[in-house]
A protein has these predicted regions:
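Conserved catalytic alpha/beta core of Sir2/sirtuin-type deacylases, generalized to analogous enzyme cores
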Residues: 1-210
């Protein structure tokens, strides 16, 4: 999470936010959990799979900001993070690391601020979990209100996002795909643009902002 927090929005994030401000995009549904669309200025935004900047209690549902949790974890485990950094641990693409057993044994978990449970997790949808009902409802509302669906920079490999494409097509709405490589929705797309996402969105901005 700390590495992701240091990431900055790219030209595609900013272009989508500008297209929304110009009225060409009615909202953004993202599979990403990095919060970069919000930082770029997208206002009507649904993070379908959650946001790593939030923590949720598995017992009572109370949520907490990740920075707040980090502060509490640092207080409960003084010097722990510095010792880990000295190890120069390799972080896997999914964010996991392999730790020696003594690091796990010595770690003190902090409780939920509401119920005291220590069963806390990032507020993201892991593989095998379902998208929460309230997010599905917002997704349905956004899809019902739009006139077309634009898929940007995604292979649409996950079923929760592929379903959005299928739902749009069933509703008779055109689906456009912009992506630099092949994806699951390509064969069903009304329009397919195989190119870099940032460049494509800037060309769209030029066409809209006249």
């Amino acid at each position: 999470w700390r590495r992701m927090r240091r990431a900055e929005p790219n030209r595609a994030h900013y272009a989508l936010a500008e297209l929304e401000q110009l009225g060409a995009v009615s909202g953004v549904i993202t599979q990403n959990v990095d919060g970069l669309h919000a930082r770029a200025g997208s206002s009507r935004l649904l993070a379908l799979h959650g946001d790593l900047s939030r923590i949720v209690c598995l017992d009572c549902g109370q949520d907490e900001g990740r920075e707040s949790l980090d502060t509490r974890l640092d207080a409960a485990n003084p010097g722990y993070l510095a010792r880990l950094e000295d190890e120069e641990l390799r972080v896997n693409p999914d964010g996991d690391v392999e730790l020696d057993e003594h690091y796990i044994r010595d770690f003190q978990m902090v409780p939920c601020l509401a119920c005291g449970s220590t069963r806390l997790k990032p507020d993201v949808v892991y593989f095998g979990e379902s998208v929460p009902a309230e997010r599905k409802a917002l997704k349905d509302a956004m899809l019902a209100e739009c006139s077309a669906l634009l898929v940007v920079g995604s292979s649409v490999a996950v079923m929760s996002s592929y379903k959005i494409v299928l739902e749009a097509l069933r509703a008779g709405k055109p689906v456009a795909v912009i992506n630099g490589g092949p994806g699951r929705a390509d064969a069903k797309a009304t329009y397919l643009w195989r190119t870099g996402v940032g460049e494509a969105l800037e060309l769209m901005l030029d066409a809209v902002d006249v």
